[in-house]
Amino acid sequence: MNLLVLALLVSCFLASYLARGLKVLPVYFVLLPELLAGVALLIVLSRLVVGKRPQLDGRYLLFIGLLVLTMAMGIVAQRVPAGAVVSGLRDYIPMLSFLLLGAAYPFTSRQIKAQLVVIGVLLLVQVPTAVYQRFFSFAHKMHTGDVVTGTTTNSGTLSVVMVSGVTVLTVLYLRRRIALMPLLVLTGFMLVPTMLNETKATFVMLPIAMLAPIFFMRRSEKPFRRLIPLVAVFAVAGVAFVGVYNAMIQHRNPDSSLQEFWFEGGVLNYVYKGSLEGDERVGRVDSVQIALREISQSPLRAVFGLGIGNVSPAQLPGFDGEYSHYYRAYKISFTQITMLLWNLGYMGIVVYGLLFYAIFRDAVLLARGAGKDAMLGQIWAPIVMIAAMCMFYKAVLTDQEFIYPFMFYAGVVGRRAHLLRQERRALKRSQAPAAERGWGPASVLARQ
């Protein structure tokens, strides 16, 4: 089973890059992650047949049920073409397969450690790849960092996964698994791609990655003793990022800087163009406003959206949605919030809000526990925070490099949190009969 997960991780990061980027594999290899998702679904179903159901809290099952219901209602209400339905399901069914796989199979700590090592290697590969793309492969496009994608789908996704890797390094330091100097060197190395592709959101993600893990440890472990060195590393990384970003941006706008973007009104102009007031440009906030305006034309649209796949173009004829011409015109792929509103309506926001709440709740439960899963929970809680923040930044839930591993480990965390709750309930039940038989402190005093 672990080989399937390792194959998934490798294929998510490399299949599309090798097939479409380098063109050293047949183009059909881009479907490998989805094929593995199908295998995962068959494994989950086979375990259900023999009575081994996924160990998950009811909130996850509610999420799956509401998601399926919302998709079905949107398809029926908007009469989505069959081809568009098939195209749309590709964004949802595979991720559910990996959520259930993580919850259904009892992966050992050793297996998860092997998986994290593979992820670490894949993240390290992104650094030389990003350097090559920026200074060699796309040297003629020095005016933009968008071409620096590593082996991932786009530059934004690359930055999200690299900053998530910094979260792992931070937790390893707080847990005394690595020393300060390796943390400093590896953090700087991991952030190189985010500097080269000029991801401004790193300025928001990095504090979460490096500072939030402190608040998900038990007080008895005295995490704040390592706060000052950690803040020092964060400051060095931040200064380095600003310096490199300002040097890179000179190729596009010599008068621009990161400080100007964040503190002198640049961020507002970046996310909001005023398209509803007549500007032809569409920013991230504009894309959400347009989605809200369009789906509010009828109650069914508002609740369930225009239906999955109905606003997305396709490479094959017959798979385009009825409103696929909206995709580029209204920048539907700008943010995940925008995509959810178009595809699933307000229910999409509610459904995924429930998912993020359930994952975060379970991660915190593990992190503040005393068991061997505490480190896993401590890693996962900040990553969930980063993912939630990125809902307003990128359409991260449709990028395989992020969403497939994210949902798999959500299942792993959910399973372990569910078992921890069962263990605690069993302990309470075992203590209750002793108190009823008169062994509790109150009954002893009463007999005296």
Question: Where are each of the predicted segments found?
Answer:
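N-terminal signal-anchor transmembrane segment
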Residues: 1-49, 69-77, 129, 440
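Loop-to-helix entry and N-terminal half of a specific, functionally important transmembrane alpha helix
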Residues: 4-13, 331-335, 342, 353, ...
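Interfacial loop-to-transmembrane-helix boundary motif in multi-pass membrane proteins
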Residues: 4-5, 55-67, 101-128
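Aromatic-anchored transmembrane helix interface
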Residues: 30-40, 58-71, 81-104
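Alpha-helical transmembrane segments of multi-pass inner-membrane proteins
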Residues: 113-140, 152-219
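Long extracytoplasmic/lumenal interhelical loops at the membrane interface
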Residues: 140, 278-344, 363-368
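Transmembrane alpha-helices of multi-pass inner-membrane enzymes
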Residues: 168-169, 355, 362, 379-441
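A membrane-periplasm/extracellular boundary helix in multi-pass inner-membrane enzymes
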Residues: 196, 217-274, 296-297, 446-447
